[in-house]
Regions:
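Non-catalytic, conserved peripheral segments adjacent to functional cores
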Residues: 2-121
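Short, intrinsically disordered, charge-balanced linker/junction segments flanking boundaries
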Residues: 124-126
């Protein structure tokens, strides 16, 4: 049986599964993998799907961080309005324990937190 190779149509049909989480405004984005004997492909970003799920701002930047030692703590990301940014955090190699804390005083989930393991294998982002 010949190997299956994925077409541009298959790639276009790859979807992001977007789920609301207990923190107000926090979402889990799970990428669908399309794979064959060569490896896999997954959609990292789709403006249309994210917009339909409530993504309100355009992407301002994309960063890549490399951590050399296990157990490293990176820090807390927070900006006061009007400089607040929407972040999409994922892990492309290894794994990370990602924790989100709601620091917005006017939020119904103020001081609540949510944590998930993000990894190269589960294709999740928060």
């Amino acid at each position: 049986m010949p190997a299956r190779h994925y077409s541009l149509r298959d790639i276009a049909l790859s979807r992001l599964n977007i789920t609301d989480l207990p923190l107000n405004g926090l979402k889990r984005v799970e990428r669908q993998r399309l794979g064959d004997e060569r490896g896999f492909l997954s959609r990292l970003f789709c403006a249309e799907e994210l917009s339909a799920a409530g993504w309100q701002k355009p992407i301002a930047q994309i960063n890549h961080t490399h951590t050399t030692r296990c157990g490293t703590v990176r820090g807390l990301h927070f900006q006061y309005p009007p400089h607040a940014e929407i972040k999409l955090v994922s892990c492309i190699r290894g794994e990370v324990w990602d924790v989100a804390v709601d620091l917005r005083r006017d939020s119904t989930t103020f001081l609540h937190w949510h944590a998930e393991r993000l990894s190269e294998n589960n294709c999740r982002a928060l």
